[in-house]
């Protein structure tokens, strides 16, 4: 993982294929609140979708990675290769885990992201999402935080993913 704010990082393959026991408490809690027809957005390997399916939830996983969608389908969950902003069907629960709010790209995209999400909800539907405050990356030894106020919001990050000889285009993440 390459980013505009830190050294290169590695996400181990086992982390992407976690069991329910291995999930952070926040993700476990979110999964307990899923109900009805559920859309797992940015599903990756499908670890959340698989857990939901095992609990009897009607779940569809989506991701823009064809490879990820193939993996999810092979794991027995219905998955589609589609961009969230192209989804038309309505759902009772929209699930955006592992910093899912980041799909908005930046603060300017947040309003459009939330409007799209709302448009996909059935009556009394819900949006379950998480995000991370990366302020800790700017903390000084004395506990103060140094942020350049003349630049864009510090939570707007550019990423690029690499795996073996494959490299994604750079993308914005909130």
Indicate where each model-derived feature is located.
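S-adenosyl-L-methionine
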Residues: 1-33
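A short SAM/SAH-binding and catalytic strip from SAM-dependent methyltransferases
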Residues: 90-111
């Amino acid at each position: 993982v390459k980013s505009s704010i830190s050294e290169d990082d590695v996400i181990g393959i086992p982390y992407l294929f976690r069991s329910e026991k291995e999930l952070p408490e926040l993700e476990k809690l979110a999964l307990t609140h899923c109900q009805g027809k559920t859309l797992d957005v940015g599903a990756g390997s499908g670890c959340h979708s698989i857990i939901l399916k095992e609990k009897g939830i009607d779940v569809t996983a989506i991701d823009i990675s064809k490879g990820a969608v193939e993996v999810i389908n092979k794991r027995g969950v219905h998955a589609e290769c589609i961009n969230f902003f192209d989804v038309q069907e309505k759902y009772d629960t929209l699930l955006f885990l592992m910093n899912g709010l980041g799909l908005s790209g930046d603060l300017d995209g947040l309003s459009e992201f939330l409007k799209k999400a709302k448009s996909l909800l059935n009556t009394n539907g819900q949006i379950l999402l998480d995000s991370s405050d990366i302020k800790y990356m700017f903390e000084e030894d004395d506990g103060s935080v140094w942020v350049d106020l003349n630049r864009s919001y510090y939570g707007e990050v550019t990423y690029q993913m690499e795996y073996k000889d494959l490299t994604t285009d750079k993308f914005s993440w909130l």
